[in-house]
From Swiss-Prot:
Name of the protein this chain belongs to: Small ribosomal subunit protein uS7
Gene symbol of the encoding locus: rpsG
Quaternary organization: Part of the 30S ribosomal subunit. Contacts proteins S9 and S11.
Annotated function: One of the primary rRNA binding proteins, it binds directly to 16S rRNA where it nucleates assembly of the head domain of the 30S subunit. Is located at the subunit interface close to the decoding center, probably blocks exit of the E-site tRNA.
CDD domains: uS7_Bacteria (cd14869)
Source species, domain of life: Bacteria
Similarity field: Belongs to the universal ribosomal protein uS7 family.
PROSITE patterns, A to Z: RIBOSOMAL_S7
One Gene Ontology cellular component: small ribosomal subunit
GO biological process, one term: translation
HAMAP family named among the record's database cross-references: Ribosomal_uS7_B
GO molecular function: rRNA binding; structural constituent of ribosome; tRNA binding
Cysteines paired by S-S bonds: none
Length: 156
């Protein structure tokens, strides 16, 4: 960690099609080996499929899916006197978004559909309806935090 000054977070350019910073971040998370145009095709294809299936606006379903996957609390390991405790801590807003997007992409990659766009679209549709692997992951994280509530006083 720097001692002199806190370095601000780099500003991300909004995506060209929907002018959304969240979507631009999502494209970056989907991207593999620096192939951004391929990642954009996948994400935009998934959004089109999603809008077709749900009949709602592209971004509205995406936002709703993200909202349902965002974790409020997580556990961090804290070593106290020879034993390690899982201490529940609140998640900062930026990390909340990052975790939600990462979990959604990971869940989509594990699905069985043919193309990545289809997998992503179906995972986002499931997440917008509060079901699916990504939502289950969030529930597991919340359950862990709830189970370790007794160690909340070890927070730093």
């Amino acid at each position: 960690m720097p001692r002199r000054r806190v370095i601000g977070q780099r500003k991300i350019l909004p995506d060209p099609k929907f002018k959304s910073e969240l979507l631009a971040k999502f494209v970056n998370i989907v991207m593999v080996d620096g192939k951004k145009s391929t990642a954009e095709k996948i994400v935009y294809g998934a959004l089109d499929l999603m809008a077709e299936k749900s009949g709602k606006d592209h971004l509205a379903v995406f936002e709703e899916a993200l909202e349902n996957v965002r974790p409020a609390v997580e556990v961090k390991s804290r070593r106290v006197g020879g034993s390690t405790y899982q201490v529940p801590v609140e998640v900062r807003p930026v990390r909340r978004n990052a975790l939600a997007m990462r979990w959604m992409v990971e869940a989509a990659r594990k699905r069985g559909e043919k193309s990545m766009a289809q997998r992503l679209a179906n995972e986002m549709l499931d997440a917008s309806e509060n079901k699916g692997t990504a939502v289950k992951k969030r529930e597991d994280v919340h359950r862990m935090a709830d189970a370790n509530k007794a160690f909340a006083h070890y927070r730093w």
